[in-house]
């Protein structure tokens, strides 16, 4: 049976989300480069792996998956006893699992849409020869500040967003934060003491640094 393959781009935050999970699990894998600038993700053979034309796609033997957060959850469960545990300390505890699931949903629907717009404006536009729209940055930073206020309150109660242990909830934030730390938006993280500590810890994990 073939090993693990990730079809994506190393600069993609969604691809990085999966790569960090694999590194946390100390799993061997092959990264199959998909060139986004050439539109390879919108053509065959990639579309046969993800009909929506978005990276990454994933294979583990005969299993084929797409959507990065679904992939990381598969990795966390399939390889639960290998490497870092990415699930709640008691993965059979329904309440703990539900809290982690809330965090995953909050990241996907409250944090990431705003943070990704800021990364696009301040990082990725430059790669395409486009100018940053400062009005958009100001608008999105105001939204992100509100999300981070919620995080600050949560992190005053717990070490991590889903409790006292590092889980997928925290991991899913890492790739876009890595980009935003190199922009003026960094101030939104550093001016909140607990958020700042949390960001420093999760971005300095060995698995996180391997995708830079």
Swiss-Prot record:
Entry-linked InterPro entries: Glutathione-S-Trfase_C-like (IPR010987), Glutathione-S-Trfase_C_sf (IPR036282), Glutathione_S-Trfase (IPR040079), Glutathione_S-Trfase_N (IPR004045), GST_C (IPR004046), GST_Phi_C (IPR034347), Thioredoxin-like_sf (IPR036249)
EC number: 2.5.1.18
Superkingdom of the organism of origin: Eukaryota
Domain GST N-terminal: 2-83
Residues involved in glutathione binding: 12-13, 41-42, 54-55, 67-68
UniProtKB keywords: Cytoplasm, Detoxification, Transferase
EC category name: transferase
Reaction catalyzed: RX + glutathione = an S-substituted glutathione + a halide anion + H(+)
Location relative to the cell: Cytoplasm, Cytosol
GO terms of molecular function: glutathione transferase activity
Cellular component, GO annotation: cytoplasm; cytosol; mitochondrion
BP GO annotations: response to oomycetes; toxin catabolic process
GST C-terminal domain boundaries: 93-212
Known role: Binds a series of heterocyclic compounds, including lumichrome, harmane, norharmane and indole-3-aldehyde. May be involved in the conjugation of reduced glutathione to a wide number of exogenous and endogenous hydrophobic electrophiles and have a detoxification role against certain herbicides.
Family: Belongs to the GST superfamily. Phi family.
Protein name: Glutathione S-transferase F3
Name of the gene: GSTF3
């Amino acid at each position: 049976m073939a090993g693990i393959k990730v079809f994506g781009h190393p600069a993609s935050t969604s691809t990085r989300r999966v790569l960090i999970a694999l590194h946390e699990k100390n799993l061997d894998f092959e990264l199959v480069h998909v060139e986004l600038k050439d539109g390879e993700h919108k053509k065959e053979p990639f579309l046969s792996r993800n009909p929506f034309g978005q990276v990454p796609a994933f294979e583990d033997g005969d299993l084929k998956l797409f959507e990065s957060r679904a992939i990381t959850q598969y990795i966390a469960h399939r390889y639960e006893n290998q490497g870092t545990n990415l699930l709640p300390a008691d993965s059979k505890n329904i309440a703990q699992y539900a809290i982690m699931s809330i965090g995953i949903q909050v990241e996907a629907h409250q944090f990431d849409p705003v943070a990704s717009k800021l990364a696009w404006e301040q990082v990725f536009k430059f790669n395409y020869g486009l100018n940053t729209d400062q009005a958009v940055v100001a608008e999105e930073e105001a939204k992100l500040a509100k999300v981070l206020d919620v995080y600050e309150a949560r992190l005053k109660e717990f070490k991590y967003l889903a409790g006292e242990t590092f889980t997928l909830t925290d991991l899913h934030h890492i790739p876009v934060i890595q980009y935003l730390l190199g922009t003026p938006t960094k101030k939104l993280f550093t001016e909140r003491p607990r958020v700042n500590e949390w960001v420093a810890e999760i971005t300095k994990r060995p698995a996180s640094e391997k995708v830079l």
